[in-house]
Amino acid sequence: MSSLGTEQFSERSQWVLNSPNPPPLTKKFLGPLKDNKFFTSSSSKKETRAVSFLASLFPILSWIRTYSATKFKDDLLSGLTLASLSIPQSIGYANLAKLDPQYGLYTSVIPPVIYALMGSSREIAIGPVAVVSMLLSSLVPKVIDPDAHPNDYRNLVFTVTLFAGIFQTAFGVLRLGFLVDFLSHAALVGFMAGAAIVIGLQQLKGLLGLTHFTTKTDAVAVLKSVYTSLHQQITSSENWSPLNFVIGCSFLIFLLAARFIGRRNKKFFWLPAIAPLLSVILSTLIVFLSKGDKHGVNIIKHVQGGLNPSSVHKLQLNGPHVGQAAKIGLISAIIALTEAIAVGRSFANIKGYHLDGNKEMLAMGCMNIAGSLTSCYVSTGSFSRTAVNFSAGCKTAVSNIVMAVTVLLCLELFTRLLYYTPMAILASIILSALPGLIDIGEAYHIWKVDKFDFLACLGAFFGVLFVSIEIGLLIALSISFAKILLQAIRPGVEVLGRIPTTEAYCDVAQYPMAVTTPGILVIRISSGSLCFANAGFVRERILKWVEDEEQDNIEEAAKGRVQAIIIDMTDLTNVDTSGILALEELHKKLLSRGVELAMVNPRWEVIHKLKVANFVDKIGKERVFLTVAEAVDACLSSRFANSA
């Protein structure tokens, strides 16, 4: 086959060759920051820019002017309903985090108010959650023993909360939300399910009234600890009372029944919301009247009341554990953000509005920073409480403020009434909330759609269940990264054919009716990048196709011999030096076989780099086309090659 014709190539090809230079590297990295709504505004006046900035920072300013008494009535009802669920759950989650009960209540006061001012979700309910509480109780004790040094443990938790808030704020300001996406939906489903089972097993301590328990979180260690502790307390002289189990199981059945009724009949949405508070009131009254604490029933005892005390002086910012606090804070920040954004977006989709992920990160970060200064630990959006808030008919984030005020009144007026609350009730409240964290239906859906995603789901589940939270997260992230890496080093390289009666060229494997052109091999690289990781694979794959094509058509001589390779680069957004080198080597090997090479629709960054590397000059500018159809037509009309 002779070389390509030298006639002037079409104007459409010039559009590709003369496209503007892509943005510089600095703009690519700093562009998202400059585009951040918190720092830019199209307004010309400084006053208007200031108002726009405040409206972006505090979304409440954009809707408070249209807030009505009718909306407040709905938010008031939602907030009170939310508080009835939040108060007992907050106490239980504080116990799960190995903190005194009041710290769970503190966490339901300040963070919800900050979020109501800065958050963009109307339905999300803020406060302590089970997964983050367990995360802290499994990671922080590895640094400081909560039993031997309770004050230092509590102070380290506040420091972790500060770092979590700082990381979350940085993610929002720098628009780094993609970091949260590394924990995929499938991995999150597995992680939540594994965490729910581990949390449930840990509640056996309170449900059975055990005094000795393991600090490990894996299922095997917890079950072993339950057996040995229970056997030791029953056979030894220690006073073990089955009343803890009786009280806990009785109210657990009541809570699960209330949850079942509320799910079956939406008119009774309020029943599972008030059931935990009702359980606390009834069980406390029963223990008080029967003097159950004198008969072995473990009770909460003293709960400190009053407004959140300052914890600024308790932060450990210059001690030996700052590094560990930052590490745990980063993990907590990502887990908390992932759960909150997933919850917020699911309900925003139901209501038909957009949830700004970066604003959510900023709001979450600011509320946790404020929380760390006011004796709170890491808070986020709770799925169970958000569902209750939604079902109660909330209209805005004011329901969070109503809930916070109600919890504050509880702290001021009613904490002394919690003295006789049995620990088994806290365990039963947490256990009743766990079924919502296990989504078997979604896991089955993941299995049907993507087996690799299901592997990440299983990895996170079994890692959390049988090893630890960190290992479960590490396994999930490793599988997710392996999936990304596998897709990067083994990109799709497809042979294209023309769909009859159209100008469309599609994968012949997917569309068997697609017709290939004799002597012309059209190939598409279905990858975002041609780089060092996959360039060799792409080069060898194309050469293998040329050899296979020639071998299959050896009896047809010139008619079957490949005369031209057309590479469709429409999907290719970037190429590095290794990718360019692979293209040059491919071009040389094709020339040695008498095969010409052409490119179709290289994106602007790709064509810019190919021109700078002189690759376009090497293959000839007339071999760059806008569409596959134009490239094939040029070949057939002898612009590309003389007919055999």
From Swiss-Prot:
A GO term, aspect molecular function: secondary active sulfate transmembrane transporter activity
GO cellular component, as recorded: membrane
CDD domains registered for this protein in UniProt: STAS_SulP_like_sulfate_transporter
Recorded superkingdom: Eukaryota
Annotated segments matching region Disordered: 1-20
Subcellular localization, as worded in the UniProt entry: Membrane
Keywords: Membrane, Transmembrane, Transmembrane helix, Transport
Polar residues: bias regions: 1-19
SUPFAM superfamilies: SpoIIaa-like
Transmembrane intervals: 50-70, 76-96, 99-119, 124-144, 156-176, 179-199, 242-262, 268-288, 328-348, 394-414, 418-438, 455-475, 518-538
Membrane-protein topology: Multi-pass membrane protein
Stretches assigned to the STAS domain: 511-635
Function: Low-affinity H(+)/sulfate cotransporter which may be involved in the internal transport of sulfate between cellular or subcellular compartments within the plant.
Family: Belongs to the SLC26A/SulP transporter (TC 2.A.53) family.
Protein name: Low affinity sulfate transporter 3
Organism lineage: Eukaryota, Viridiplantae, Streptophyta, Embryophyta, Tracheophyta
